Amino acid sequence: MCDDDVAALVIDNGSGMVKAGFAGDDAPRAVFPSIVGRPRHQGVMVGMGQKDSYVGDEAQSKRGILTLKYPIEHGIVTNWDDMEKIWHHTFYNELRVAPEEHPVLLTEAPLNPKANREKMTQIMFETFNSPAMYVAIQAVLSLYASGRTTGIVFDSGDGVSHTVPIYEGYALPHAILRLDLAGRDLTDYLMKILTERGYSFTTTAEREIVRDIKEKLCYVALDFEQEMSTAASSSSLEKSYELPDGQVITIGNERFRAPESLFQPSFLGMESAGIHETTYNSIMKCDVDIRKDLYANTVLSGGSTMFPGIADRMQKEITALAPPTMKIKIIAPPERKYSVWIGGSILASLSTFQQMWISKQEYDESGPSIVHRKCF
């Protein structure tokens, strides 16, 4: 399937980033922000060829004159007109393909409303004339990418986190838990605690700088209290960061205080269990006979699990919650930022999967509800 002329397309639509490419590839070819920007003011320069909307990186670079919107909130599509623009941009500008010539595999958040899957299906067949399509659950794809069919996936991106127990390739919906705490919240919290230190970050442009600081310098402490006292008594944990204007700032305990809120959401003023406890609660909602398999196959996925130290901390916290003799294994694949996409690439290129596609003909006969019968 490495022939681009017939290869299936794989599109993973996240709250923060779209990952798109061809089935059979080992990484997405296009990764760009899930944003649509519209000009705030009427164009004054005649003949400048100003567009009525911009998508992705172009919207990001012109953000000074645009109003930016994210059509995917907390992993779920809330604005279909903008979503259509993002898909159009993906096909024609990023991948440069004719959508009517390629089957397309889309991803969806766990517990995505039924109406949403139908709408996705409808847009693919009616707007883009896809020959075939399929909708797969993001966490299930991450598990496939790790070479497993049973396990529990903790998937955390920019807009939402989920714990998804999966048995023999099927997600167990009654045990899926959602946590509205993810990358964007960590960036906001880092902005807040850096502001308390006297550095001012307020605009959306400055938020991007803070996101970069987060990605480059933050880590998860194995023992938070001990790390705090180390940070207070010496400067060994301090790192410097150069802002775009050349000013250099120093960041100390903020490096691990921001990601700590994954384990202690009370830092963000949220009354919710941390990611370790949510994972444990999710396992406890499953049948007692499969828990052992879940503990031994806990897979991390998504950009917000990229912090150094997160796997060791997760191991420590879940060990403390689980029965004393239980074998616990946290799997943190190095490519986990893109593991949903990679899993989609693997799935769409399997010979056994080819009969699973929803074809245009099936859609014409049954309508959008076909998606519930063929994709689960």
From Swiss-Prot:
One of its GO terms (molecular function) is hydrolase activity. The keyword Aminoacyl-tRNA synthetase does not apply. The modification N-acetylaspartate is found at D3. It comes from the Eukaryota. It holds the Pfam family Actin. This is Actin CyI, cytoplasmic. It is an enzyme of class 3 (hydrolase). SMART domains: ACTIN (SM00268). It catalyses: ATP + H2O = ADP + phosphate + H(+). GO terms for cellular component: cytoplasm; cytoskeleton. Belongs to the actin family. Keywords: Acetylation, ATP-binding, Cytoplasm, Cytoskeleton, Hydrolase, Nucleotide-binding.
